[in-house]
Amino acid sequence: MKSAQYSLVLLLGFTLLYLLPLEFRALWQPDETRYAEISREMLSAGNWIVPHFLDVRYFEKPVAGYWINNLSQMIFGHNNFSVRFGAVFSTTLSALMVAWLAFRLWRDKTVAVLSGVIFLTCLLVYGVGTYAVLDPMITLWLVAAMCSFWLGANAQTRAGKAGGYILLGLACGMGVMTKGFLALAVPVLGVLPWVIAQKRWKEVLLFGPLAIISATLITLPWALAIAKAEPTFWHYFFWVEHIQRFAENDAQHKAPFWYYIPFLIAGCLPWVALLPGALKRSWNERHIESGTLYLLGWVVMPLLFFSIAKGKLPTYILPCFAPLAILLARHATQLVATPRTLKVNGWINTVFGAVCALIVLLVLAPWGIAKHPIYASHEVLKVIQASIAFLVWALVGYLTTRNNARLWQWAALCPLGIALLVGGMIPDKVVYSKHPQAFVDLVRPELESSRYILADSVGVGAGIAWEMKRSDITLYAKPGELDYGLTTFADAKDNFVSRDDFASWLALHRKEGNVSLVKLLSKDSVLEDSDVPAPDKVYHKGRFLLFFYEKTP
């Protein structure tokens, strides 16, 4: 295949996987609705220094990730595409840097291109990279740090080394402004094995201060600005968001040490058969190829760091897939002459896709053996779409086994069916619990006529705020992640109404206009709710419930 044709195929595949589906999937709560609304409020208020969420100060993250999302919404407007494009943009830049680093290491265009392709199509990378969270942004800056250090360490002149370390500091500084101080810890841990093995301590001590200075310079303006505007920000962000989340017994999302192992393995689909050999080859070559040791350090050390931390989420290990993709690509190119592993990889994809399709048809479908099927009887079309999505995975996997020496790279298209069909195969049980936009569409006239809107879920409230383009959503009964902002700042007290106070609050405020209370029911809850006054209208769909109170004289 000629270079121009190859480039066209890559561009087409990227468009189908990463760009085309973005608009046609509803936003998920709480994550996507949160980040959509925070950026919308930043743009609306013109305040790019202090994040606000539902008109409440929100200190869980710094601002650089929001800035990327802000720019996306400025360019593309108020739609699902713009909400997710910041993540796609960051993931794409990360893939380009992965390809660049692979080429710098081995001067092999095939390995370089495959590294970027494998990175983009790893299941975890694809899932997070098209989802509106901040992890793709922090991954971007950590990959930039990985590349910058290698650039500086291998420069032949003092100026080149200084430039690499300055870029390293800038990347780390932007990482701090995206998700905090782990952007300093992860690069240090990642390069540590290589620095020790290569005995580069003198160089690091000589040029390292340049990285510290550049990181400080790029971070300082915003750090001072938010400290002046909100003096409590740094105390909360450092102690609560870092110490408690990563070390203390009450850390969020606690999980065992081995938690990330299954996510690392499954996250490598559709390339998972390459993983054992790639890691083994890298370990065996660690003393022969310094670049291999460097990449291995960037995989293992952050993985250990996040495994030791008590708070864990699958998205935290996203940066590990950048060096891992290069190791997988290089290992794969070494296997072409003896492609048994490549054939095994094809069969794994075939079995995975076929088994998932069978689970949909025989277990999850309305006629399936599950006691409570996830699909309802009227969702046959969704069952068909889900089955086709996984059958595409199986079919592509099977095709790669027919001539695996030539076609194994086409495994990159395994996720294509899911990418194109996932928006239409989500069961209503999920839609009407995780997609507030769907419920808003059903009750839009009531919400538009409401002077006050309350929600007992921050994620649902964010979805309503985004859809209605209004940030004055009052939280009811459950402050959730806005608890700090609601309890710390006196000007936020009107943004929350307790269950006990609701009746008196309603009697007073419905004189000013209609009131809507949107609730997210628990899975086992009943429709009746004796805790609130009788509404004039009730709308119920799935786990979403709207109590509508008309204005009183």
UniProtKB/Swiss-Prot annotation:
Domain of life, source organism: Bacteria
Q: Which GO terms describe its biological process?
A: lipid A biosynthetic process; lipopolysaccharide biosynthetic process; protein O-linked glycosylation; response to iron(III) ion
Q: Which UniProt keywords apply?
A: Cell inner membrane, Cell membrane, Glycosyltransferase, Lipid A biosynthesis, Lipid biosynthesis, Lipid metabolism, Lipopolysaccharide biosynthesis, Membrane, Transferase, Transmembrane, Transmembrane helix
Q: What is its EC number?
A: 2.4.2.43
Gene Ontology CC terms, in alphabetical order: plasma membrane
Q: Where are the transmembrane segments?
A: 8-28, 83-103, 111-131, 132-152, 176-196, 204-224, 255-275, 288-308, 317-337, 350-370, 380-400, 407-427
Quote the InterPro entries the UniProt record gives: ArnT_tfrase, Glyco_trans_39/83, LipidA_mod_glycosyltrf_83
**What HAMAP family is this protein classified in?**
ArnT_transfer
Protein role = Catalyzes the transfer of the L-Ara4N moiety of the glycolipid undecaprenyl phosphate-alpha-L-Ara4N to lipid A. The modified arabinose is attached to lipid A and is required for resistance to polymyxin and cationic antimicrobial peptides.
Official protein name in the record: Undecaprenyl phosphate-alpha-4-amino-4-deoxy-L-arabinose arabinosyl transferase
Tell me what organism the protein belongs to. Enterobacter sp. (strain 638)
